[in-house]
Amino acid sequence: LDWLVYHATEVQEPVKRSFYAHRHTLRAGDAEALRKRASDLFTQRWALVEDHLVQAGPYHLGERFSLPDIYLLVTSTYSKDLARGEFPAIDECVRRTASRQRIVPILEDHLRGLGRIASVGVPQ
């Protein structure tokens, strides 16, 4: 449960600040600085996940696949560019999760949804 909450609150928060910087600033000129700070926070939080997976992986619960692995996969589809650096343990967890037979259709549906969002734009 700890990792699921971590992803939902700590990892997701800077993603929202980056994508919706205009919602978190009083002056339009501050949005880019906020995006940079969000990227810094995301990188720090992604690094904590990386360290955990290096120590305990390949999944969040070692050899046991779990819901936080799905959350990591989904988050990685739209936010990995926020992180600066290399994250091979995250990449491996994402690869393993994405290749699971029951996850494939879920991921395909998620990616179609991202495509629809991209075609209409991010709500302001």
Put a short name on every predicted segment.
Residues 110-124:
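Acidic/histidine-enriched, glycine/proline-rich intrinsically disordered or flexible terminal extensions
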Residues 12, 102-105, 118-119:
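Residue-level signal for secondary-structure boundary elements
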Residues 29, 90, 102, 120-123:
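Juxtamembrane helix-loop transition sites at the ends of transmembrane segments
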Residues 96-112:
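Charged phosphate-binding loop/patch that engages nucleotide di/tri-phosphates or the phosphate backbone
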Residues 3-98:
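GST-like fold's C-terminal all-alpha helical module
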